[in-house]
Regions:
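Short acidic/histidine-centered micro-motifs embedded in hydrophobic/aromatic stretches
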Residues: 31-35, 78-82, 102
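Short, charge-rich, low-complexity alpha-helical interaction segments
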Residues: 18-40, 114
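Long, charge-rich, low-complexity intrinsically disordered regions
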Residues: 2-5, 10-15, 116-120
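Amphipathic protein-protein interaction modules
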Residues: 47-97
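Intrinsically disordered, charged low-complexity linkers and terminal tails
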Residues: 6, 10, 31-32, 58-61, ...
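Alpha-helix boundary/N-cap detector
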Residues: 4-7, 23, 27, 94
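Long, compositionally biased
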Residues: 94-122
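A ubiquitous short alpha-helical element
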Residues: 1, 42-50
């Protein structure tokens, strides 16, 4: 998908389940921005503590995945090429610490200080 065609939450979840390798981070953030209000919040990801306002992309994606009861691999696919090209292709690198920690600790390592997303009502 590209940003030229706006996706719905259901479009994104369908793409995620049918063609996870085609999901792009920018599209995920666009869907989140379109359908949710975001409130910066701190969160733990394994031993890493992210302060409110830091690593907001990871915060949004992880909270969206939690709201939609996604599996660990579905959640990782939401990070798009950051996961596929940067993390999977370079397993010993140290970039994308939140993605790498989620690979290692999964949902057991995630704890939000408060709700980060609230679905918009029309």
């Amino acid at each position: 998908m590209s940003l030229n065609k706006l996706m719905t939450i259901n479009d994104l979840l369908t793409q995620l389940r049918q063609a996870p390798q085609s999901v792009e981070f920018a599209d995920v953030i666009q869907v989140i921005s379109q359908f949710y209000t975001y409130k910066p919040t701190g969160f733990n990801n394994g031993p890493l503590h992210n302060l409110a306002g830091n690593n907001e992309g990871s915060c949004k994606v992880l909270y969206f995945a939690q709201l939609n009861a996604l599996t660990q691999i579905e959640t990782l696919s939401l990070f798009g090429s950051y996961y596929r090209d940067d993390v999977l292709a370079n397993p010993t690198a140290t970039d994308h610490e939140n993605i790498r920690n989620f690979v290692r600790y999964g949902w057991a390592g995630i704890k939000f200080d408060r709700a980060a997303l609230k679905i918009l009502t029309l």
